[in-house]
Swiss-Prot record:
UniProt record similarity statement: Belongs to the universal ribosomal protein uS8 family.
Biological processes annotated in GO: translation
Protein name per the record: Small ribosomal subunit protein uS8
Keyword Oxidoreductase: no
Provenance organism: Pediococcus pentosaceus (strain ATCC 25745 / CCUG 21536 / LMG 10740 / 183-1w)
Length: 132
């Protein structure tokens, strides 16, 4: 069965594993998912990310992060730009998620970056997701 929105599937797998407090999860690899996973790791939302090569497209293993009392680090994920309704922003319209507590992941001409980087570089793009 073909998947119409692999980014939404990636976010949903993270959300579901986070809700039941799994240590890790695996998703089929793609360049955009690798970039998103690296952003989540660099921003401190996940513990680690590992790439597994196989004969097909490869697998991304994401290790989730929890606080001292097993509280969730990721409290919410939301897909913004969907295949049926794309959402683009100009450089001066880049959104802030929860006044800077969360991040927006944006696909730009310079690759997949966070909202902070997009504001610093003064570039816009397609808003893929909000994570807080």
């Amino acid at each position: 069965m073909s998947m119409t929105d692999p980014i939404a599937d990636f976010l949903t797998r993270i959300r579901n594993a986070n809700m039941v407090r799994h240590e890790s999860l695996e998703v089929p690899a793609s360049k955009i998912k690798k970039d998103m996973a690296e952003i989540l790791k660099n921003e401190g939302f996940i513990k680690d990310v590992e790439y597994i090569e196989d004969d097909k497209q490869g697998i991304i293993r994401v290790f989730l992060k929890y606080g001292k009392n097993n509280e969730r680090v990721i409290s919410g994920l939301k897909r913004i730009s969907k295949p049926g309704l794309r959402s683009y922003v100009k450089s001066d319209e880049v959104p802030k998620v929860l006044n800077g507590l969360g991040i927006a992941i944006i696909s730009t001409s310079e690759g997949v970056i966070t909202d902070k980087e997009a504001r610093a570089k003064k570039i816009g793009g397609e808003v893929l997701a909000y994570i807080w």
